[in-house]
Amino acid sequence: MGLQQICSGVWCAEHRQKFGLGFVVPCRMTVVRLASGGLWIHSPGPMDDARAAQIGELGRVEYLVAPNLFHHLHLPAAVERFPEAEVHAAPGLERKRPDVTFAGTLGVAAPWGDELQPIPIEGMPTFREVVFVHRPSGSLLVADLLFNLRRRLGPAVTTYLRLTGGYGRVAQSRVLRLAVRDRPAAAASCLRVLCCPFDRLVPCHGEIVEHGAKREVEKALSWLLRDLERPPDAQSVNVAVPEV
């Protein structure tokens, strides 16, 4: 699928990725045009001639971003296509991808931070995910922190996603929940996400939520936040905690 503009200055392209057990799930690459006119690419996907040309028509690629320790399979191809771009990745990815030269490690500060606020999700060392809030469009970009898979993906994968709680709504799968090693740290990180201004959710896996995304994200994260004492600046975040 080619690039599709979802709002001013933001484009997405979907591809299908095969995982373990033969499961195939949709994945999304997001391209953001910065105020400089340069491009910032989140979770690069397959980069054939046609897609590289489409991206080139939008502007010069300045940054390639691998947002966690699993979203890197197509990074070398993107580097080959856009050799002048800086590569920024989740902490620890440089050990998994010694074939890629990294310009920086994702954290709370970034050269694009005025437009795309990075928020590291602590307490999940298996993923080391960093999510981003695109301030101009009010969009939250996530990789594996949240899914929104609603389309049928075949009997096996749909059944698996239902069993792991990652199907039919904005949700965190049980696989990700099991990856939490420091619950207070993870909860504090997710609360920082909820304190940011966003209305749209752009996940790597699943449907985009165009409006009202914050409420959906609150519901998905409520299991993690239920015991957290919220700071005064977060009192406006009303998290509904379900009985479990």
Q: What annotation goes with each model-predicted range?
A:
Residues L225-V244:
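A short, highly charged, low-complexity intrinsically disordered segment
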